[in-house]
Regions:
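Short, extreme N-terminal leader segments that mark the start of a protein/domain
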Residues: 1-51, 199-200
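Internal mixed-charge
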Residues: 11, 15, 22-23, 103-200
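Short alpha-helical scaffold segments that flank and stabilize functional sites
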Residues: 27-30, 59, 181
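Hydrophobic alpha-helical elements and their junctions with loops/disorder across both membrane
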Residues: 31-34, 63, 185
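Polar low-complexity intrinsically disordered regions enriched in Ser/Thr and small residues
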Residues: 35, 88, 186-189
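N-terminal start-of-chain detector that recognizes signal peptides
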Residues: 39-41, 96-100, 122
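Short secondary-structure subsegments characteristic of cysteine-rich extracellular domains
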Residues: 42-60, 163-179
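Divalent metal-cofactor coordination and adjacent catalytic microenvironments
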Residues: 47-115, 137-153, 157
């Protein structure tokens, strides 16, 4: 089996040419697996990358208050009267992954059907949103995403729990570096990791 790559980017590495395929190929190189030219090509590597990429991306976006994925917005009110003693109900945007806070730290609760309950009116929120354009990802975020994707691919593609554990460990290191660099550019809120990020 090919040796697992160990190189990591610097914080200043450009991500201008980053694409979904390039992130997937970075993960495949870490596993010593063949690279792909498209996510819809007829190969097991492409099929598995297409299956796991979006899930890995969204989970990674959720686990930290990334500056590049932050949106400040006024939520749209709903006509429905909320239960649980809250005065107002609001609709969350379709690309919202996590509500970080409301203005003036007003209490809130997020429930099913992408609805937020609160007493605040209007509800001005800080959100983490889904970013689908990889060209917007900082270089260290790309590194963490590739490591996490490599961990997800290790067993179904390479049949190797050893590689999976190695990639999870390196993912943890890459995530720490990405968080530190992101925090240096603005305030961030630490968030508990989703279990999917730390174990299968």
């Amino acid at each position: 089996m090919s040796a697992v790559a160990s190189s990591a980017p610097s914080a200043t590495t450009s991500s201008v040419m980053t694409s979904e395929v390039s992130v997937c190929n970075k993960a495949l190189r870490y596993l010593g697996a063949p690279e792909i030219v498209a996510l819809d090509q007829p190969s097991r590597e492409a099929d598995l990358c297409a299956r796991y990429y979006a899930e890995a991306r969204d989970e990674l976006l959720e686990c930290h208050h990334w500056n590049f994925a932050t949106r400040y917005t006024s939520l749209a009110p709903l006509a429905a009267v909320p239960p649980f003693g809250f005065a107002w109900a609001y609709r969350l945007p379709g690309d919202c992954l996590r509500v970080r806070r409301l203005r003036d730290s007003q209490p809130f609760e997020v429930v099913e059907a992408r609805t937020l309950y609160t007493d605040a009116a209007p509800a001005e929120a800080v959100l983490t949103v889904r970013v689908t354009d990889p060209a917007r990802f900082p270089a260290l975020f790309v590194e963490a995403l590739a490591r996490r994707l490599a961990a997800a691919l290790a067993v179904p593609l390479m049949n190797s729990t050893r590689l999976e554990q190695s990639m999870l460990q390196r993912f943890g290191d890459a995530l720490d570096a990405a968080r530190v660099a992101d925090a240096a550019e603005g305030a961030s809120d630490p968030v508990e990791l989703n279990p999917w990020l730390t174990a299968r």
